[in-house]
């Protein structure tokens, strides 16, 4: 497992309290990243156990939903694929747009880019995009300025060498991290603004066509840019051909 640089200890002085808080925030973020990397290292073992559980379920004909959002998610199909470093399936295929188009540190729609990940408000939302029925992944590194990849047994996990926007993506698994200094409602449109990609009822990224949006398996009416980002929410955008809404299994992810 890659080693992680220890954050510098805060120094005494008039700004000691602020530095102490920054240090504590960095420690919390570092601990979260450590848990993610440990989880990634255990994916193979978890998958093996999962095979046994699936076989048992098939025998007795019953199943149990442990995901916090499973009961409220109307989508009947679950996204599948190799588990990534956040124990959410990695998205395969041609990315919708490169992460390199994203903003490079300037404030975007009130959202700042800071050297440490903020932890006062910390949730995760999943976004899936289909274009004419074909999955178009979100690339890792959106909202992470000058990203650096940490290689894990389950794929790359990106961290910033400069700063993190409060909305960002660590891996190519569709998970949008909302990590902000205060609790407020952020939107999908703000995420696309950081990415510098279009999002309207007729366009997603550079792709034009009728856009159908789903939130937790339920069709969303209105401007997709206004969709709020909420904890363990599954958002799906279909450009052109409509795909039956899908969800992810959050129950194994430490998110």
Where are the language model's segments positioned?
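Hydrophobic single-pass membrane-targeting/anchoring helices
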Residues: 28-62
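Terminal targeting segments of Actinobacterial cell-envelope proteins
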Residues: 1-34
């Amino acid at each position: 497992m890659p080693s992680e640089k220890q954050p510098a200890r805060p120094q005494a002085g008039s700004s000691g309290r602020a530095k102490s808080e920054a240090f504590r925030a960095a420690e919390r973020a570092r601990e979260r990243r450590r848990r993610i990397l440990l989880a990634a290292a255990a994916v193979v073992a978890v998958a093996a156990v999962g095979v046994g559980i699936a076989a048992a379920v098939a025998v007795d004909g019953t199943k149990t939903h442990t995901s916090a959002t499973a009961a409220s998610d109307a989508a009947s199909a679950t996204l599948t694929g190799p588990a990534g470093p956040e124990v959410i399936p990695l998205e395969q295929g041609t990315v919708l747009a490169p992460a390199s188009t994203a903003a490079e540190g300037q404030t975007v729609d009130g959202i700042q880019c800071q050297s440490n990940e903020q932890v006062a408000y910390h949730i995760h939302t999943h976004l899936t995009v289909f274009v004419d029925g074909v999955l178009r992944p979100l690339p890792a590194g959106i909202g992470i300025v000058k990203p650096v990849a940490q290689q894990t047994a389950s794929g790359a996990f990106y961290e910033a060498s400069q700063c993190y926007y409060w909305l960002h993506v660590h891996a190519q698994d569709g998970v949008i991290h909302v990590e902000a200094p205060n609790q407020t409602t952020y939107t999908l449109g703000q995420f696309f603004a950081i990415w510098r990609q279009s999002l309207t009822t007729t366009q997603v990224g550079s792709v034009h066509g009728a856009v159908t949006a789903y939130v937790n398996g339920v069709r969303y009416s209105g401007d997709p840019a206004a969709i709020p980002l909420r904890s363990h929410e599954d958002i799906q955008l279909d450009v052109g051909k409509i795909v039956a809404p899908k969800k992810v299994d959050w129950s194994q992810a430490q998110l």
